[in-house]
Amino acid sequence: MKVQTEIKTYFNYINGNWVSSVSNNVEPSINPANRHDIVGYVQRSTLEDVNEAVTAANEAQTSWWKRSGVERGEYLYKAAHILEQCLQDIAETMTREMGKTLAEAKAETMRGVHILRYYAGEGARKIGDVIPSSDSEGLLFTTRVPLGVVGVISPWNFPVAIPIWKMAPALVYGNTVVLKPASETAVTAAKVIECFHEAGFPKGVVNMVCGSGSVVGQGIANHPDIDGVTFTGSNTVGKQVGRAAFERGAKYQLEMGGKNPVIVAKDADLDLAVEGTISGGLRSTGQKCTATSRVFIEREVYEPFKAKLLERVKQLKIGNGLDAETWMGPCASESQFHTVLSYIEKGKSEGAKLIYGGNRCLEGELANGFFVEPTIFEDVDLQMTIAREEIFGPVLALIQVDSIEEAIKLANDTEYGLSASIYTKNIGNALEFIKDIEAGLIKVNAETAGVEFQAPFGGMKQSSSHSREQGQAAIEFFTSIKTVFVKA
């Protein structure tokens, strides 16, 4: 394809150098708020590019591991400092490339800074335990060693935070990495990797290969010299990645979809519940794995809750995320835009009652982007498609229930188990919910979306491979335990 000279081309990062794909092919990254705006051109890489990156990572791993954890952490501190200096540019790029508001993009980039600093500190923490031995002359202890080369396959919805929360622990524990960012946000990823480059990481320790999931992603999952694969994305692709890694004996970590419920008890603070439902379900255009999708409301407060919800959603401004007044931006890509619209049509055709939104936004400049109105359905049956499948868009399904017990039972009627929330003033309701809800992330009087980097994150059932990311739990995936017995 012919490249416009005024638009920058971004390259793969292999062995400390910015390089073109051996294919010499690039593809445009499109601004979803204005499909005529090309953010940049990114590489369409091949398996040969993957092989080069893995070779570089493999050759660098031993010397990287021989450095102390404290020294490895110093590189993360440097990267954090540079990322913070570049916050405005990276956030603006993220907004142009993915569509979320600039405020959200800034917050996410700052989250990346905090994650890097957190894991920099982990380089000085313990990596084992002393265990009493039954032999009075023996010393029994454990230590941890890195996996080796880790493949990181990251999604487009958090193009700064998710790659960093995977790469930072991998690196501080002595692994080298090959990042495959989502094609939709590869320009943002390149700017993040530039921060690692400027931080002076040794050649081969950090690598990035851009391209399709079917070529680059699957190439990473299948590669015999990649010792671990950490993936965030759809269930369909995640299962393919996990299967490929399992078949060759590599360690794998999958964070996938969600169909996250909110329960609104009859004693709830309805204003708080409405704000949490809207923020959890509609911010970032509902494109979060922890986004609210199903809302179970006790019958006694259903009508007042619905009225407040509709009143509030009418106040939301839809527009370009670079506009300071915008509350909700576009769907991140044309394909996601059409996916969301198709789910809305399924909801209507299967008998759910559309009470708000449901249309493409065609007013003024919105017609140039992939904008969908916030959409609310009621009279939703649990067997309807919109109540069962992850939509990844600004769509809420309202469901009346007669009790908290019924709400929990219905909320658990899904293959997913990522995040769940309850709004209540009754501690008994909260404790029952915490005990019985099938989710890895549980919120009380707070929205389903949002995680804290210092705490373990992951789901149950089909939402996860049952491992956990972030916090000190990250060491469990990115290292292996050695048990050592020493005889005096």
Swiss-Prot record:
Temperature dependence per UniProt: Optimum temperature is 55-60 degrees Celsius.
Positions of the catalytic residues: 255, 289
Disulphide bonds in the chain: none
InterPro entries xrefs: Ald_DH/histidinol_DH, Ald_DH_C, Ald_DH_CS_CYS, Ald_DH_CS_GLU, Ald_DH_N, Aldehyde_DH_dom, AlphKGSA_gudD
Reactions catalysed according to its record: an aldehyde + NADP(+) + H2O = a carboxylate + NADPH + 2 H(+); an aldehyde + NAD(+) + H2O = a carboxylate + NADH + 2 H(+)
EC number: 1.2.1.5
Residue numbers binding NAD(+): 233-238
Keywords: NAD, Oxidoreductase
UniProt pathway: Alcohol metabolism; ethanol degradation; acetate from ethanol: step 2/2
UniProt GO molecular function: aldehyde dehydrogenase (NAD+) activity; aldehyde dehydrogenase (NADP+) activity
Enzyme class: oxidoreductase
GO biological process, one term: ethanol catabolic process
Pfam families in alphabetical order: Aldedh (PF00171)
Function: Oxidizes several aliphatic aldehydes, particularly c6-aliphatic aldehyde and hexanal, but does not oxidize benzaldehyde.
Quaternary data: Homotetramer.
Family in the record: Belongs to the aldehyde dehydrogenase family.
Protein name: Aldehyde dehydrogenase, thermostable
UniProt source species: Geobacillus stearothermophilus (Bacillus stearothermophilus)
